[in-house]
């Protein structure tokens, strides 16, 4: 699976290989009038806030931006420090953010397996059905513990009109998720 931890992901060799590829992608994107967006995930090479900051420090290029998905930074060891982690991301990376995701995060209880949703398509790529691994589950917005008030407030400080893409939901859940997000935007004066 693309989502399960691999030991090489957290080595200097793995980081250097990833850095070279991302550097090349950033240059190529920039040469074609685009920006390559990095989306992090805890089990990937770039998964923590510190690893993200390190990557942007080493690939300081206008062709590289961040796809902000705060839920992808949370693991069992830091989910209880949610506000601290959210503030750390914004305090160190806000100028790199180009697009934002809206989904949620919560502890998965006793289920430590890789989690996938039944989206009604048995042949769907795992990237479309993935909903978390280990002790963390990544449901649709409003179905978890993400501090959306803080997330949207911090996001809007420098990015008031940023595209926010809802993910990890089924088609029939779109109205509920949209109502949830609209309510959070309104409640925070956004």
Residue spans for each PLM region:
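Short active-site-adjacent structural elements
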Residues: 108-111, 172-176
């Amino acid at each position: 699976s693309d989502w399960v931890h691999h030991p090489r992901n957290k080595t200097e060799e793995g980081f250097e290989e990833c850095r070279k590829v991302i550097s090349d992608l950033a240059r190529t994107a920039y040469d074609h009038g685009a920006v390559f967006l990095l989306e992090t995930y805890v089990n990937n090479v770039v998964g923590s806030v510190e690893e993200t900051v390190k990557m942007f420090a080493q690939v300081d290029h206008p062709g590289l931006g961040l796809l902000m998905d705060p839920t992808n930074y949370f693991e069992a060891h830091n989910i209880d420090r949610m506000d601290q982690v959210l503030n750390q991301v914004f305090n160190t990376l806000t100028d790199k953010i180009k697009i934002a995701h809206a989904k949620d995060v919560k502890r998965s209880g006793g289920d430590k397996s890789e989690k996938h949703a039944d989206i009604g398509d048995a042949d769907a790529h795992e990237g479309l059905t993935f909903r978390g691994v280990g002790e963390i589950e990544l449901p649709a917005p409003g179905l978890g513990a993400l501090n959306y008030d803080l997330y949207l407030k911090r996001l809007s400080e420098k990015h008031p009109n940023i595209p926010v893409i809802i993910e990890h939901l089924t088609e029939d859940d779109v109205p509920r998720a949209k109502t949830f997000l609209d309510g959070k935007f309104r409640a925070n004066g956004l």
